[in-house]
Amino acid sequence: MANWMIKGANLLRPIYEEMRKELVSKQFLHADETPLEVLNEPGKAPASKSYMWVYKTGQFEGNPIVLYDYEVGISGEFAKKFLSGFSGYLHCDSWAGYDKVENARRCGCWAHLRRYFLNALDVQEDKTDYSTIAGQGFLMIEKVFSLEKTPGKKSEYTLDEIAEIRKEKSAQAVQEFFKFCEENQGRTLPKSLTG
């Protein structure tokens, strides 16, 4: 059955390539990668990790495009090659490999950032103690998330209108969060979950 999948993928490769060209022509993209184990992969130990990369157009880019790219490892070179020709905003996590994507302006992912604070809360003795740095940071990000839901459905507003709403409502919460991080930077260990 795996051979059928491989043959089918090869037949669809020209369509996939056209979709990739369309994807990299957009102004806003999302990218992420996740490890997976493939049994009996040629040239690799059985327990070694490979990666599935996902690339998606932004929510205001018209017809959505989501493409997956399987690679044998994790390297910024894979993202650089896949996103060749892209020059826009790349919404991704803080992994340094995405720095290799030329002409991309990186935008940090608040969901990934939120996860660090949530993980730090999970290892606290009292997981509901929001007076800690982890708890306060988590609540501040939750506030940003709740304000970001305010604009409503994408069809209701233009990008300029959403930017204006963000200036009015979200900007102050974001500034407060970054100020909180700067003020507490010396109170956390660099290798800790909130460092």
Model-predicted segments: where are they?
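Catalytic center-proximal scaffold of phosphoryl-transfer enzymes
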Residues: 1-195
